[in-house]
């Protein structure tokens, strides 16, 4: 299977999915989602280490809140409803200088992403992300210093007043300082 759409290294991909997730089972929050969607992705190489990507994805999500859901879940469902369809457009710029794709020991990977729902979607929001991974050898015992960081911002536009709680950014977790 050749992932490239043209001889110049332009890539094209497709995705189709269906997800049922009960977040109460994971003790995360008291709600469940059913969602399905499809998308198409294109990637274009700028040079040996840089690439841009353009993605378009359709998504339909149904959210069911359990008893006594968190305030952010209730606020979103009261404001925007519990079933909605979105068409998301995403642009990505990547710069990768890793010495290898799996288990790198030197180099960095930087991604800048801008995602927005297309006007006419049931909810209108946008996200900006910056992801960075840096690996440097420590010079003894084959040890490698690794740093992974992510910054993000989410906002709404149009008639949407509350950001989708399932798209929010969170700090902390088992792999955080």
Describe the residue ranges of each PLM region.
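Gram-negative/organellar outer-membrane beta-barrel architecture
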Residues: 1-100, 109
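C-terminal outer-membrane beta-barrel translocator/porin domains of Gram-negative envelope proteins
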Residues: 69-177
